[in-house]
Amino acid sequence: MVSSFVLDYMHLVCLGHVKKVISLWIKGPLRCRLSAVTISIISNHLKSVRDHLPRNFSRKPRSLMEYSQWKATEFRQFLLYTGPVVLQGRLSAQMYNNFMLLSIAMTILLSPVLCCKYCGYAGKLLKCYVTNFAKLYGTEHLVYNTHCLIHLADDARKYGALDNISCFPFENYLGTLKRLVRRPQNPLQQVVRRLAEKPILGEDGRQSKAQIPHSCGPTLPDFPAHMQFRQYRHEGTVISCCVGDNCFDVEGRVAVIRNIIQLLSGAMYTVCQFYEQQDCFCRYPIDSSCLGIRTMTQLSDHLYGVPVTSLTKKLVVLPLRNGHVVFPQLHDH
């Protein structure tokens, strides 16, 4: 019966444990507390990658000192994407490796594909994480949230990827409801009227639509007659020439979009460059390239035409000192 009550990772992991860990770095015991200089460096790095995140991420990174005001999506973003980059070389090796145990485990449990293949492995990572957490931060911090981490893989085994059973959809829809209310009087009636006027089923947001025409190129010689656009919405996904929304996985290769073209036939193509060299981002606790997390260097000089239908996965790309690190985008908000 107890196992039938699922754990919500939004509250357990994001608003619970990750928030707790950051608080220990800032004002915890001396053995795990970071210096003010290190916190400032991490915070500045976080703010510097704001423009590199996809626009459908509703919140951009803020200073680590503002963690008490972060929303659940910000803690999730830190755990899965920005944290592994900005913490590298700033935490001790033991603390960073322990953070990566949690980050990699959650990446697996939040991906529908990886969850099916590596659910058992993610459970082992979480048990290892909790054991090492006690050694690094002290057993006095092994609270209920920390203990429950070891049971997340059991829920994923039963119900699939953890986003299937999280509170995030309800939290996101709450914002939609709030936008339907214009004044404090009779809020329920206002919501009912707005819903009756225009059913918010999301069809409009998923319609394919080319936006922001231009004529600046680059183009390809085998596309003689065409229109050029800076942005295209395809089945709810924003495809753009701008940093943050211009990197996609194409048959295992990372494509950087330079232009969007509509042929006379109506077919939509992107003009892309591909990264030519890639390596894994980290080797602990697993070769990260197995999860699609890679470092990329050296863009090709050649341009290629790629149909928008071939852009299978949107990527989160963050700058490194030499090159970029690529993460599969697991969420659209």
Describe each PLM feature range.
Residues 1-4, 8-15, 19, 23-333:
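Terminal interaction-prone segments of large eukaryotic proteins
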